Amino acid sequence: MDKFIGLDIHSATFTLAVVDGHGDLVGHTERKTSEKNLIEVVSSIEGRKGLSVEEGPLAQWVKLTLERYVEDFEICDPKENRWISDAGYNDDLTGAEKLVQLYRGGYTKAIEHPDRDGMALRRTFLHYRDLSKQ
């Protein structure tokens, strides 16, 4: 991987930190959260890239929005990222920088999220289950 991306996302804004293969910070940005802004920023990063975002309300949306723009996409368990969670207050940039360093080093724990087909299958199964309980 040429570049590693850590994404700290909220409903209003997102902060993104980028490091190279040596762990040196090569860029960061903060923007309003929108599909257009996320795609624009991630697409502008050159080279093979991987992205990590912590599990949260927007994680599945981020996956569906960005996974085709990166070579590796990971949603990780925030409880396992003790360097971030045990540090007390972290501003968004510090959180994104710590996340990307953990991701680059292989210290994050991935959480599986379904793709579009998997989501449709899950909805169908849950609908069937609900109908069979009646």
Can you say where each PLM-predicted feature lies in the sequence?
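Phosphate- and other anionic-substrate recognition elements at nucleic-acid/protein interfaces
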Residues: M1-Q134
